[in-house]
Amino acid sequence: NFPSLKEAWVGSNTAGFALMNTQSYNLELGDIADDDRGPKNGEVIYRALEICATVEDFCHFLDTIQKPSGIEANFGVIDAQGGAAMFEVDGNSYKMFDANDPDVAPHGYVARTNFSNGGELNKGYGYVRFLEVDRVLSKACAMGGITPQLIFTDIARSFRNNILDIDLRSGDFNYPKTSGWFTDQDFIPRNNTSCSIVVQGVKKGENPELTVLWTILGYPPAGVAVPLWVKDNLPAMMSYDKEKGAAPLSAASLKLADEKVFHFKQGGGTKHYLHWENLYNLKGTGIMQKLVPVEEKVYQEALPLQQKFYKDGKVNVKELD
């Protein structure tokens, strides 16, 4: 997010209204360069977080903004009134997919990657990634347990590819069976992934300030989830550092990814080579494996605090120091 530019790509406000963007690449027809799609997405999210409180407010916002809007995106929205929906938005129109409508979302969720269902068929990106997201969520719904931990572990850090029918964590892609390298193709975490965020909202009648933004800054397999409450100030490790050019946690995670994971840089195209052995290995010394106890410690401290806030019906900022 870039407050100085009045741009944001994900966030929540004090009303419990939360909004995220995943760029769509198949809503606007024609020969459009990828970098030229959705130039106003960030500005729209920033403004919506300033003025919207509900899913209905966001519908009105989209109805009344100037057209063409410069938007091309899938917007995920939740509010503190029980609203949850996905919006496929182009420069002149939008389509809403209500997660509370069993005809639209029979399992109670709506998922998107970098294509829109209402867009041009077989265009865009992320079809293979979508298969993995849908597989994980449908199973979790059947077992009654979609949690931030599950989303981070089984989605944001998934190295399954459903077309190849492989999971790098199986052990079959580590030394000594292989060189420990693989190609970064259609896994959910990619070499350009810069964060993963789960917004844990509230039910109707609950205090919106109880909304939590569980946040991994940087490359998710090399990062740690941190809970953030809107009422609290951002901790220094999650705030922009001018010298580092990013928040300290983001800079550290991206540095690990650059130097240990995507560090084969001999010629064009080599950024897609993934040093899997450094991320995950049979000795248990991979980056992801070493960070597991660190993140577990975060959950051990944060979850009881979150439960206490729910019991009290409010967030006590002093307890977050």
Locations of the language-model features?
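C-terminal, well-structured catalytic/ligand-binding subdomain of enzymes
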Residues: 1-6, 10-11, 15-17, 21-50, ...
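A conserved hydrophobic secondary-structure block that centers on an alpha-helix together
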Residues: 53-60, 65-66
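Short arginine-rich
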Residues: 67-73
